Amino acid sequence: MERLRRLGLLSLLAASVGCADDAAVDPFAGPVPAQCPVTSTEQSMVMTKLVLLRQSAPGISDGFNLDGRVSGADDALSCRRRDLTNPDGTAGVDNQLSLLVPALDTATAGALDAAIQGAINNGQMMLAVSIEGLDDRLNDPCVTVVFRRVQGSPFVGSDARIDPGQTFDTIREEPVSRVTGRMRNGVIEAGPFALGLPVAVLTARFVIPIQNAQLRIRWRADDTFEGLVGGGIPAAGMIAATETLVIGSDLMGLVRRLILSITDLDPDEDGNCRSFSAAVAFEGRAAFVNP
């Protein structure tokens, strides 16, 4: 009997230790899984605003540290392009596109932001983002973020933004980008991944290939969203895309030279960088997306 009682106590002790171990497991520990568990809950949004981030002051820009370095003019691995500083004081931000945006403003007679907004509002350039595999809308150790180009005839409110709650159709022949990430306190972080950012502004039609993209999305309580995407854009591809713009040859040559002057990522064998860093901010509102 005494032996049985001791065995029982040992079993209870082992069980309690096992429970304690289970309770101590941090679901956010380790790398993000390549695939998240499937759940019946997802949330979609349509981008209602998209902005190519400029420098708010010389050397100051939001964005990501894409190469894990804080580079100065003496850093050969970044082709001697100086990193920027986040508005909160964090150094190492990679957003060389911010040096090109003023030239793009010139190409559109100072109406770059308005042209992008107009293309979104008239349904010409709509991108939907879906958050799949949701277990919790504040803290979730694994969610899948899906970018799709969509089409439809959006209703626009008095605030000059697409109204929430509308339904749009996926453009099936367009590429779809997926990435797994984590959500903490309503903020999703994910990457790196490949993202094709469609541009349909004025007469321009092209896709910007963003490599090794990093993503941050804040999901607010009112089902609005704000986000930031950063990554590397191949210089050769961007030059080819800008050649579709209806601008003069002098300005085209200037844009080409500017692109080649801001490359700071993906150095080749000779140390010449083949891509430049970029950061894009966006806002979104809840929507329904037909597959």
Regions from the PLM with identified roles:
Residues M1-G8:
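Bacterial N-terminal signal peptides that target proteins for export
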Residues L9-L13:
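Hydrophobic helical h-region of N-terminal Sec-dependent signal peptides
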Residues D22-P291:
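Extracytosolic secretory-pathway proteins
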